[in-house]
Structures are given as structure tokens and as C-alpha cells.
From Swiss-Prot:
Highest taxon of the lineage: Bacteria
Family label: Belongs to the universal ribosomal protein uL22 family.
Protein name, per record: Large ribosomal subunit protein uL22
Keyword Calcium part of the UniProt annotation: no
Organism of origin: Endomicrobium trichonymphae
Assembly, per entry: Part of the 50S ribosomal subunit.
GO molecular function: rRNA binding; structural constituent of ribosome
NCBIfam families: rplV_bact
GO cellular component terms listed in the entry, alphabetical order: cytosolic large ribosomal subunit
Key words, A-Z: Ribonucleoprotein, Ribosomal protein, RNA-binding, rRNA-binding
């Protein structure tokens, strides 16, 4: 059984979120929550929140045994464009990026690792 959770329009850059997701792919949920608890990155809080939502969607609220992170990816959301004053009266663009984060968890017993 698979369960999915998504967070959309979150104000983090995709590159920073993807660094955290690389640490949790294809790992058990118990181990993943432990990693995210001690990770000194601000995006770890977001990823942990979405992961807990995915496990709750799987029907396991406190018992994470037997669940594994099958897929975790980040997509680009809309970019908020702002302007900063530059030299000689010019303006310089600032891109405030957003992300769409998706995590899919599945039972470890039914999970088949791709080779």
C-alpha cells in the first residue's frame, strides 16, 4: 500500500530541499525521522512535516515500523520576482523561488528495489 503527501507553494529553493531529500530516499521511516531530527538545515523541518503526513495517510499515526520512503522529489513552483536597486539608477532582479514537495511511502514488505 502506498501513501502520498504533498506540500505546495513553499518558500524554499528547490536546490536546498533536494539536498535533504537525497539523504532520505529509499530509507525506512524510523531512520529517516531520526536523521531529520538532527539535521541542521531549515528545510529538514518541512521535509519531516510532509513525511509525517504521508505516514498518517498510510494509516500509521505513531507506529512507523514497516514503512519505507519509496519516492521523494521536489518540483519548481512559481517564482516571485522582486526588484533591488542597483548602481547608476538601474534595477536588479531578485527571484524568490517556491517548491512543490512530494513524498511517497510504502510498506517495506511490498517494496521491490529497482536494479
Amino acid at each position: 500500500m502506498e501513501a502520498k503527501a504533498t506540500a505546495k507553494f513553499v518558500r524554499y529553493t528547490p536546490r536546498k530541499v533536494n539536498q535533504v531529500l537525497a539523504l532520505i530516499r529509499n530509507k525506512k521511516v524510523e531512520k529517516t525521522l531520526e536523521i531529520l531530527s538532527f539535521l541542521p538545515k531549515s528545510t529538514a523541518v518541512l521535509v519531516k512535516k510532509v513525511l509525517k503526513s504521508a505516514t498518517a495517510n498510510a494509516g500509521k499515526f505513531e507506529d512507523y515500523s514497516g514503512l519505507k520512503v519509496k519516492e521523494a522529489w521536489v518540483g519548481n513552483g512559481p517564482i516571485l520576482k522582486r526588484i533591488r536597486a542597483g548602481s547608476k539608477g538601474r534595477s536588479m532582479p531578485i527571484k524568490k523561488r517556491t517548491v512543490h514537495l512530494t513524498i511517497i511511502v510504502t510498506d517495506a514488505s511490498t517494496y521491490l528495489r529497482k536494479k
